[in-house]
A protein has these predicted regions:
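Bacterial N-terminal signal peptides that target proteins for export
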Residues: 1-8
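N-terminal signal peptide c-region/cleavage motif recognized by signal peptidases
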Residues: 16-18
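Short hydrophobic alpha-helices and adjacent helix-cap/hinge residues
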Residues: 21-308
Length: 308
């Protein structure tokens, strides 16, 4: 883990005390260094506190593994060995790592795109889905600019990312475009991506690997004079033109309530999986203008947030 990750881990562990200072322990796995997951975690900690489980009664052990299979597995294993009372994960890869490491500890996930399709399901697990309709994102994009080819940057080893890429292919006939799949296994591979002459827009999938390389991907798209779209919150601040994502506050709050119920003795099977009800649409007018894209007023009116 890099120095930066350790610093961020310390900053996010505001609700944690040294092991043994509280009656209960909650383990959390945050995939990569994503601003969206950081916001989810803040909402999670606040929600847990409102339910009566603050730093005086619960220790929070946060793991921020690099976005690769070995790191996810190691993070889950460390928390299982620590004998936490509940395990929480943000993103599908971390959730799958938890499933593989324990069948007895209650598990809670948040921010998972299409949980069932990604295999994020177990008898000792519940959570809140992070899926919003991809078709809605494409409708908004079509209002902004015509497109016949969309490049999707994803990771073949992150099942929710793969599912999103597959859904994009399924929407080709409805919207009249072709999908250009661009797989990367590590963030540094994003530098090799070429969009010019190949795509009219770029979708950065929900992949933790792809989102760690967001600044590189956005820059490559700028050079190709094409917009970037996303379904991960916080990406518009990095130059994404159009972002449609589930509210991180809702995701974290729901996870917090679920963990509180588990700490009180309920079983995961008695807590139904939730779906997002709050969706945030962010339009980056500044980036759109730099690309020569005129955003229609009705799209601006629909936006939850506009970056000027």
């Amino acid at each position: 883990m890099s120095v930066l990750r350790w610093i961020l881990t310390a900053a996010l562990l505001l609700c944690a005390l040294p092991a043994g200072a509280a009656d209960k322990t909650v383990g959390v796995i945050m995939s990569g260094n994503l601003a969206y997951y950081q916001e989810v975690h803040k909402a999670f900690a606040a929600s847990l506190g409102k339910e009566g489980f603050d730093f005086r009664t619960v220790d929070t052990l946060l793991q921020m593994p690099s976005p690769d299979s070995l790191s996810w597995a190691n993070a889950a294993r460390k928390l299982v060995v620590a004998e936490v009372n509940v395990l929480v994960s943000y993103g599908a890869p971390a959730a799958l790592a938890m499933i593989r490491e324990t069948k007895s500890i209650p598990l809670v996930y948040a921010g998972v795109y299409a949980p069932a399709a990604a295999g994020v399901s177990a008898r000792n697990m519940t959570g809140i889905s992070g899926k919003v309709p991809l078709t809605s994102l494409l409708k908004y994009l079509k209002k902004m600019t015509p497109f016949s080819r969309i490049a999707v940057v994803y990771n073949e080893f992150e099942p929710d990312s793969v599912k999103q890429a597959e859904e994009l292919v399924e929407l080709e006939s409805q919207y009249g475009f072709k999908t250009i799949k661009m797989a990367i296994k590590r963030p540094d591979e994003a530098r090799k991506l070429v969009f010019a002459g190949k795509a009219d827009a770029v979708l950065i999938s929900v992949s933790a690997v792809a989102n760690e390389a967001i600044d590189v991907i956005v820059q490559q798209a700028r050079e190709a004079k094409i917009p970037v779209i996303s379904q991960i919150g916080g990406t518009a601040e990095h130059g994404v033109v159009l972002c449609l994502a589930p509210s991180p506050s809702e995701q974290g709050a729901a996870a917090g309530r679920m963990v509180a119920r588990l700490l009180k003795g309920e079983q995961p099977a008695s807590i139904p999986v939730e779906v997002p009800r709050m969706v945030e649409l962010v339009v980056n007018l500044k980036e759109a203008g730099a690309l020569g894209i005129k955003v229609p007023i009705d799209l601006i009116s629909d936006a939850t947030k506009v970056i000027k």
